[in-house]
């Protein structure tokens, strides 16, 4: 709708259902969906009554950047909006720059700078008002090529009215580098955890450790991992069931890249952005991307990038897209239009348009074409002004629910400079999957006696795991299963050559240790991973 609440659609003749949806929890839709019939060259008028349930600001913030080019100035764009039902007084935004980015200037200027944190005073945001912040920063010339840089932003006030106070635990995750170790800390900022949950540690693109944790209110748990040379570390810690999205995601996430450098001073890159960063809180956001030496100036980026060449993601992962454009012609562009045909596997009802480099408006045409209109834009050509010739716009969208594994989601955008033919971006695509991250859990850690073959499958497992031992050892054999705290979970007798099935009856997900002993002594030991 426009500022007066009026809306219009251009439709082909036919029957339609018209309803309203909002991500803002301050409205009550008091009427059922409207059924309308439109004839050719006809106009239908429909009112959509709604009731305001809370008069309160609903402040959101988003961040995007065309690129973090190596050894040159970067443009960072922040969009702060009040989508609530009441003006937002004393509004401010904090932006924390990556350690490798040095602040150069901004419009508007910050009212304070504390290290890498910039504070901007927005005074009062009216209902449905948005304010842009444009920051210029310089990338450190000594940073590794391809390193990931993150910009975080938070808007205040950040209260969401009408929500039930959360009375459960609230886990926060942090990551630091301490000499030769990556140190994760899990802090419970809520009530005592009633049950244990699991945390998972990733090293680059494999799962390195899964272990349980349970924290009382205010308790902090430190997890220290010896840093492998060049590796990227990430931790995911489960929140309690029904954890509200306005407080964060169902997992707490932290990561650290390049704690222990390679001999050449570099480190493994590209692993942070292939996973979801965890940004569901409306008043907070984090934007991460790798620095580049050269890049396609007109493309469509997706975050997370997805795992491996198939860009695997888990079902129900929120998707953040950034469309980048640059005027590489020989004259100023005065209008840019972007048309992005949204895949039917994405839910347009969940669309959230984010930050952009220039003022724009957007609409949806022909059912599923998302259109961004920058008119006027006055975009100089790259020969006249390399920095100012770039632009970008971002949006978030959710997957359709419960897509089956193997589903591929792909789409691309067309970028129109003035009245020239469109530049078509490469496809951005994902594949839905599960259990695609390999685990550093060997089926057999050690086979102590030779000539004995121990088979354990599947591993990881969910409901049951199979054991089979073949070899010269004489039975019976004893299988002992313990958790990581050394508590015995199960003990069974096995026979050489026979297959044994171990059922996971009400076990907690996580890593378990097994040992097989025979008359001659220990035969083998290993790890099992029970998945949720």
Feature locations, PLM:
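Exported/extracytosolic protein signature
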Residues: 1-445
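C-terminal outer-membrane/trafficking sorting elements
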Residues: 446-457, 461-532
């Amino acid at each position: 709708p426009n500022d007066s609440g009026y809306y219009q659609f251009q439709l082909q003749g036919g029957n339609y259902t018209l309803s309203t949806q909002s991500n803002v929890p301050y409205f009550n839709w008091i009427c059922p969906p409207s059924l309308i019939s439109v004839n050719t060259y006809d106009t239908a008028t429909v009112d959509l009554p709604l009731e305001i349930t809370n008069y309160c600001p609903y402040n959101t913030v988003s961040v995007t950047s065309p690129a973090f080019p190596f050894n040159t100035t970067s443009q960072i764009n922040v969009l702060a909006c009040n989508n609530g039902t009441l003006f937002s007084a004393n509004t401010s935004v904090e932006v924390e720059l990556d350690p490798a980015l040095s602040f150069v200037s901004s419009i508007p200027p910050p009212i304070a700078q504390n290290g890498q944190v910039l504070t901007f005073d927005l005074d009062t945001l009216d209902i449905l008002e948005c304010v842009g912040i444009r920051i210029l920063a310089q990338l450190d010339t000594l940073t590794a090529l391809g390193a990931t840089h993150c910009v975080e932003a938070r808007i205040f006030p950040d209260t969401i009215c009408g929500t039930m106070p959360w009375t459960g635990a609230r886990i926060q995750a942090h990551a630091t580098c301490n000499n030769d170790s990556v140190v994760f800390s899990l802090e419970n900022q809520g009530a005592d955890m009633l049950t244990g949950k699991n945390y998972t540690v990733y090293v680059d693109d494999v799962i390195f450790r899964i272990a349980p944790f349970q924290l009382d209110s205010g308790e902090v748990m430190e997890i220290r991992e010896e840093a492998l040379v060049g590796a990227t570390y990430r931790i995911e810690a489960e929140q309690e069931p029904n954890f509200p999205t306005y407080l964060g995601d169902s997992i707490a996430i932290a990561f650290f890249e390049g704690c222990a450098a390679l001999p050449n001073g570099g480190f493994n890159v590209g692993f942070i952005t292939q996973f979801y960063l965890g940004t569901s809180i409306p008043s907070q956001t984090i934007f991460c991307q790798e620095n580049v030496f050269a890049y396609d100036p007109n493309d469509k980026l997706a975050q997370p990038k997805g795992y491996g060449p198939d860009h695997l993601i888990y079902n129900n992962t929120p998707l953040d897209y950034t469309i980048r454009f640059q005027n590489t012609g020989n004259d100023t562009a005065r209008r840019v239009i972007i048309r992005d045909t949204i895949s039917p596997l994405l839910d347009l009802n969940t669309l959230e348009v984010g930050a952009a480099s220039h003022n724009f408006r957007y609409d949806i045409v022909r059912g599923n074409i998302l259109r961004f209109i920058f008119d006027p834009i006055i975009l100089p050509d790259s020969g006249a002004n390399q920095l100012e010739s770039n632009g970008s716009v971002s949006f978030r969208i959710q997957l359709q629910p419960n897509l089956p594994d193997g589903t591929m989601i792909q789409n691309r955008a067309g970028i129109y400079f003035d009245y020239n033919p469109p530049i078509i971006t490469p496809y951005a695509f994902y594949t839905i999957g599960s259990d695609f991250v390999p685990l550093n859990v060997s089926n057999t850690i050690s086979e102590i006696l030779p000539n004995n073959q121990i088979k354990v499958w599947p591993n990881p497992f969910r409901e049951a795991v199979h054991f089979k031992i073949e070899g010269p050892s004489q039975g019976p054999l004893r299988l002992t299963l313990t958790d990581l705290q050394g508590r015995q979970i199960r003990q069974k007798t096995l026979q050489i050559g026979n297959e044994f099935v171990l059922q996971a009856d009400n076990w907690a997900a996580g890593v378990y240790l097994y040992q097989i002993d025979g008359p001659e002594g220990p035969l083998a030991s290993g790890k099992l991973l029970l998945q949720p």
